């Protein structure tokens, strides 16, 4: 089997803060290295704004609860909404309510997200290795914080 699942029930996986302010927390549910597919839950506090970033992979998002405003397309997504972001979709999202979202990333390479400045220069990235490190951290007691950037 190519897919690795977290060795704990989802309810027992600790939320892992992935930004300095702890506005974004994640649980890696599964990771398939060969197909480069990652499934996660994100818990994001109201007021968080992603800034411009580009998904270099296909991304499916389902809003379990909360609300997201996509500044790039001027669209709000709320509880029960599904959103598909094609590979190389660049956008800027703001979480207007505390939100819980399910995300499925499917990439053609090890790069998933590029974080951009206002001139679209790449400032940081989110890679398969970051997700692997997150899964390892969440599989252990205490869940130490790994070094991935925000989402």
Please provide the spans of the model-predicted regions:
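Residue-level recognition of well-ordered beta-strand positions that form the cores
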Residues: 41-43, 67, 104
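Short intrinsically disordered coil segments
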Residues: 57, 116-123
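Short acidic-glycine-tyrosine-enriched beta hairpin
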Residues: 33, 69-95
